[in-house]
Regions:
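Surface-exposed, low-hydrophobicity beta-strand/loop segments enriched in small/polar/acidic residues
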Residues: 1-123
Length: 123
């Protein structure tokens, strides 16, 4: 008998809550002018829409984008999914905004830890 293993959900996602409808995840509206890929750390803008975490003053990381990439144009929103609570992630496999400092990445991980999204070492 041949068994074919499917693609893992994500290289950055070590564990999440089990159950119907994936309770760790939330559907989100992706803000305009975004390019989100699997494993991108996101925040929510003033309208509650997901955007790449940029580490600006008072910005709080709200989750990690999961699934197929979503690119939105100027003035156009999209649909996506984020891991928003209770999960274990491999920090070195997460995607941050290009040029984001290590200190701001650490701050984002601290925000995620408050949501019970914690880091583990890669195998």
């Amino acid at each position: 008998m041949t068994v074919t293993l499917g693609k893992p959900t994500s290289a950055w996602l070590a564990n999440e809550l089990d159950g119907n409808h994936r309770p760790s995840r939330e559907n989100v509206v992706v803000a305009a002018s975004q390019e989100l890929t699997d494993g991108t750390v996101v925040s929510l803008n003033a309208n509650g829409q997901a955007q790449i975490y940029a580490g600006v003053t008072d910005e709080v990381a709200a989750g990690i984008f999961v699934g197929d990439a979503v690119t939105t144009g100027a003035g156009v929103t999209g649909a996506g999914v984020i891991v928003a609570r209770t999960a274990k992630v491999v920090a070195e496999n997460l995607t941050f905004k290009s040029g984001l400092t290590t200190a701001k990445q650490t701050a984002a991980l601290a925000d995620l830890a408050k949501l019970h999204i914690t880091t583990v070492r890669s195998a």
